[in-house]
């Protein structure tokens, strides 16, 4: 994939999790993982994993590193806030809207009232110190249509979409706009955190495990990557790119943000997730409302599969690593032997792939072990989330399946608890391990219920189909 030239002064930094092989001859990492060989000239241009663009050659190398997802951008500057219009879709949330508007001082704002029972009036924002235009739908057409209405009235080069239940934190706009000095970038999203102090168990869980919070690590937004989409509760887009792909799909009532991200990627645009920028969201913390919302998110998988075949697969895994864990799950001597043989074969294939650069056996072993562990976590997650109805039936009928499901539920919950604990702020009381596992299981059951509901409604099994690669 190629793109427009990056400007001089633009820099990239190799991700610290990327493995440097053969004394700098190759980089192994990214999302999805790949091996990127570097010519001697390219090796010499990298200093401490950093590269600054100063000519056409360095610009091309920087683009290659970014597109290989092994490096992150360090832009020099970006557009001004004067180049941005904020679009706020709202329906029957006057208090949230006023709370948001108070944080948008000095910005141009278009409020799209999507059929509120009490219409939003321009006079509602007197004294807010921002330029506000109010548009109204006489009846609700959905958030996607409301965003498109706002987009059609924008004249600036960039448009920010903020839902009425969010509040951006100081410095959010500058941190996001910097990425647009790359002319290929069409969309940038902040990290979404909780708005209120966590005052119950669900709120404390959401503070570390919200579906909207994509974590503390910056990332490109690509299908099957660590960040495969970003929620439209808070995003900034290049208006021309958004208009070119037709804006939001108004026929979708869930997952329209995922659909937009993937259509932009398919058009050749680049998308970024920038967790330095923070936007607070008023999470649902009532257990019933929380469960229903998680299920609602799940219903989008099947319609997305129809529009983007292969991009919603619950499992993307090598056939040989899948064989390792399936044979291990058999639990017999033959199963253990077959699992060991499959692991050796998988390791041999990895060693052969890495043979293009000088690598030590220890490095090959580390890469192979990482691949096996990653596939194990994928399997545990898929069993408990996407395939839980099948897993429960199997657990009732077969003892070995029961043991496998129990192990998957515990491993997935423990690993999730360990990796997500760092997402909470200092004022939030941590959720205990057992409580986290229970809520994670409810989270997955809710999403899986919505997923299967969508599959039945669409009569399409694509959202359940794994991708097994050779």
Curated annotation (Swiss-Prot):
Belongs to the glycosyltransferase 2 family. It comes from the Bacteria. The lineage of its organism: Bacteria, Bacillati, Actinomycetota, Actinomycetes, Mycobacteriales. It is a single-pass membrane protein. Disruption phenotype: Cells lacking this gene lose the ability to utilize ethanol as the sole growth substrate. Glycosylated mycofactocins are not detected in this mutant, as well as PMFT and PMFTH(2). This is Pre-mycofactocin glycosyltransferase. It holds the Pfam family Glycos_transf_2. GO terms for molecular function: glycosyltransferase activity. Involved in the biosynthesis of the enzyme cofactor mycofactocin (MFT). Acts as a glycosyltransferase that catalyzes the oligoglycosylation of pre-mycofactocin (PMFT), adding up to nine beta-1,4-linked glucose residues. Is required for the in vivo ethanol assimilation in M.smegmatis. GO terms for cellular component: plasma membrane. InterPro entries: Glyco_trans_2-like, MftF, Nucleotide-diphossugar_trans. It is an enzyme of class 2 (transferase). Its EC number is 2.4.1.-. Keywords: Cell membrane, Glycosyltransferase, Membrane, Transferase, Transmembrane, Transmembrane helix. The chain crosses the membrane at residues 315-335. It is found in: Cell membrane. SUPFAM superfamilies: Nucleotide-diphospho-sugar transferases (SSF53448).
């Amino acid at each position: 994939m190629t793109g427009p030239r990056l400007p001089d002064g633009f820099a990239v930094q190799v991700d610290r999790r990327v493995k440097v092989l053969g004394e700098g001859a190759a980089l192994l990492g990214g999302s999805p993982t790949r091996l990127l060989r570097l010519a001697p000239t390219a090796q010499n241009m990298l200093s401490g994993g950093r590269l600054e663009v100063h000519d056409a050659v360095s610009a091309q190398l920087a683009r290659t590193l970014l597109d290989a997802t092994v490096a992150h951008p360090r832009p020099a500057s970006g557009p001004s806030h004067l180049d941005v219009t904020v679009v706020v879709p709202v329906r029957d949330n006057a208090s949230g809207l006023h709370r948001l508007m108070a944080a948008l001082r000095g910005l141009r704002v278009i409020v799209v009232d999507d059929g509120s029972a009490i219409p939003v009036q321009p006079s509602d924002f007197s004294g807010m110190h921002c330029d506000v235009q109010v548009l109204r739908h006489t009846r609700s057409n959905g958030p996607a249509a409301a965003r498109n209405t706002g987009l059609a009235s924008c004249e600036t080069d960039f448009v920010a979409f903020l839902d009425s239940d969010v509040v951006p934190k100081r410095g959010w706009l500058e941190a996001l706009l910097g990425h647009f000095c790359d002319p290929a970038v069409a969309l940038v999203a902040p990290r979404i955190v909780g708005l209120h102090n966590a005052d119950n168990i669900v709120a404390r869980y959401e503070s570390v495990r919200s579906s909207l919070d994509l974590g503390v690590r910056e990332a490109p937004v690509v299908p099957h990557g660590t960040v495969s989409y970003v929620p439209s509760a808070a995003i900034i887009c290049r208006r021309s790119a958004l208009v070119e792909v037709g804006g939001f799909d108004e026929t979708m009532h869930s997952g329209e943000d995922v659909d937009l991200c993937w259509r932009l990627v398919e058009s050749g645009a680049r998308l970024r997730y920038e967790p330095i920028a923070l936007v607070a969201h008023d999470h649902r913390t009532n257990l019933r409302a929380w469960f229903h919302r998680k299920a609602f998110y799940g219903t989008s998988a099947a319609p997305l599969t129809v529009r983007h075949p292969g991009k919603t697969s619950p499992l993307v895994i090598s056939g040989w690593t899948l064989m390792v864990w399936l044979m291990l799950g058999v639990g017999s001597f033959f199963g253990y032997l077959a699992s060991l043989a499959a692991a050796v074969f998988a390791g041999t294939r990895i060693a052969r792939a890495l043979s293009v650069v000088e690598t030590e056996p220890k490095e090959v072993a580390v890469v192979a072990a990482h691949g096996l562990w990653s596939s194990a976590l994928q399997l545990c997650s898929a069993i408990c989330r996407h395939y839980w109805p099948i897993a429960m039936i199997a657990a009732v009928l077969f003892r070995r399946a029961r043991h496998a499901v129990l192990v998957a539920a515990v491993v997935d919950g423990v690993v999730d608890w360990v990796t997500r604990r760092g997402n909470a702020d200092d004022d939030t009381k941590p959720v205990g391990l057992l409580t986290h596992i229970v809520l994670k299981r409810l989270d997955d059951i809710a999403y899986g219920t919505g997923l299967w509901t969508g599959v039945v409604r669409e009569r399409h099994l694509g959202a359940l189909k794994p991708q097994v690669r050779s």
